[in-house]
Amino acid sequence: MTLSPYLQEVAKRRTFAIISHPDAGKTTITEKVLLFGQAIQTAGTVKGRGSSQHAKSDWMEMEKQRGISITTSVMQFPYHDCLVNLLDTPGHEDFSEDTYRTLTAVDCCLMVIDAAKGVEDRTRKLMEVTRLRDTPILTFMNKLDRDIRDPMELLDEVENELKIGCAPITWPIGCGKLFKGVYHLYKDETYLYQTGKGHTIQEVRIVKGLNNPELDAAVGEDLAQQLRDELELVQGASNEFDKDLFLAGEITPVFFGTALGNFGVDHMLDGLVEWAPAPMPRNTDTREVTATEEKFTGFVFKIQANMDPKHRDRVAFMRVVSGKYEKGMKLRQVRIGKDVVISDALTFMAGDRSHVEEAYPGDIIGLHNHGTIQIGDTFTQGEMMKFTGIPNFAPELFRRIRLKDPLKQKQLLKGLVQLSEEGAVQVFRPIANNDLIVGAVGVLQFDVVVARLKSEYNVEAIYESVNVATARWVESTDVKKFEEFKRKNEVQLALDGGDNLTYIAPTMVNLNLTQERYPDVVFRKTREH
């Protein structure tokens, strides 16, 4: 049976994100994945090694200085017969909200682990997120050109700490200075390591068969014997790869390599395009939407300001769920019930934009946004429904923002509201006074806000501590009780960037007492966009 041209396009798409602890090598992997997809000819190592060629996927001013990817960018590249969309997620521990929402837009994740360190804190948190949707996970054990921990130990740690079975696909031969390559358990082939630096991909020599004397000659008898012994253990102790269990998020195929040395990344990519799911169905408040439907639907999972410093614009990132986007098509923005013609959608190669003529399920397109699009917005060809599962979290840290020049209040408010719409920070305006309080999930976000207010809105601001422990969105079906609650707690109430009523608690004790006192009021820790 031959598929229609539309279904062929859908079947080709793979959309994934990379999750890792900071410094496990995520940005390098991103570069090398693009290199193997031939998208970047000079895969820029982060921090540019003294040149101005900064890594292609880190592109805001502050990221360039810190060498961390703060904003999520999107890159599309061809690999074999597939078209792969890679969503780059902020690796720094502070940026969990943006990262969290990005993970709602992918069908699969690649977990990168520094093989010298093993499972780290941030990886645990991100895995919890992928668990909520049982996202399939591939694992890449990175940095084999350094001295690493025992590979069996690493697998045990992943299984015990992340509660997912490991199915090794490749197995390392030596490590650090003695790293000789990897053996592929399912192809019965050894790939010999030659370091490829920068953007050169070395021709890899392949030795067929585990008992081939060529193998002993190539890696030395000791390492060859060690490999055979380890493989006996591995095959006895670890899981066989099973595609159904992988798709259910129960086991993860594990690959070993070194992204910096351009080695092993292609084995992982081969696995990704072969096993990862084509675009998956999504739930809305009325029904499930599948990628094979020909009517267009999509949702916005991220908004980013000033991708182009020359244009003071914002771009909304939309994941296509079903149907084909064509230039100039009319779409309904469900939240405001308005039809809009979209003629200038963008596709991305981090920081380079090109106008897109068409896009299919799994693709991410950028919509120019002049303040009318919000995170979580659903676009359809007329059907009134809303995609669910795109969360907003109650922040855990709060600061008051103060102006150095009081005359710039208007620009400050505009800047903060725009930054909150894009999800970089949450802003709260207390009802009882003129303070501006910002809430974040991590400390680094406050520095980002101050830096961006200065560079993008020309507003010099400082932040100072404020007596707020936590915030909850409040609502109630009992109008009378809610009015009484609002009247008696006015001092603790604020409006967030989207004008939703929020209770700002000075202490957790205060929050608990207030919740007990008003059982008819719902205090929410997360809010659907």
Curated annotation (Swiss-Prot):
Main location: cytoplasm
Keywords: Cytoplasm, GTP-binding, Nucleotide-binding, Protein biosynthesis
PROSITE patterns: G_TR_1, G_TR_2
An example Gene Ontology CC term for this record: cytosol
Residues involved in GTP binding: 20-27, 88-92, 142-145
Single GO MF descriptor: guanosine tetraphosphate binding
Domain tr-type G, first and last residues per copy: 11-280
Compartment(s) where it occurs, according to its Swiss-Prot or TrEMBL record: Cytoplasm
GO terms (BP aspect): regulation of translational termination
Domain of life: Bacteria
NCBIfam families: prfC (TIGR00503), PRK00741.1 (NF001964), small_GTP (TIGR00231)
Family listed: Belongs to the TRAFAC class translation factor GTPase superfamily. Classic translation factor GTPase family. PrfC subfamily.
Function: Increases the formation of ribosomal termination complexes and stimulates activities of RF-1 and RF-2. It binds guanine nucleotides and has strong preference for UGA stop codons. It may interact directly with the ribosome. The stimulation of RF-1 and RF-2 is significantly reduced by GTP and GDP, but not by GMP.
HAMAP family: Rel_fac_3 (MF_00072)
PANTHER family: PEPTIDE CHAIN RELEASE FACTOR RF3
Name used for this protein in its record: Peptide chain release factor 3
Originating species: Klebsiella pneumoniae (strain 342)
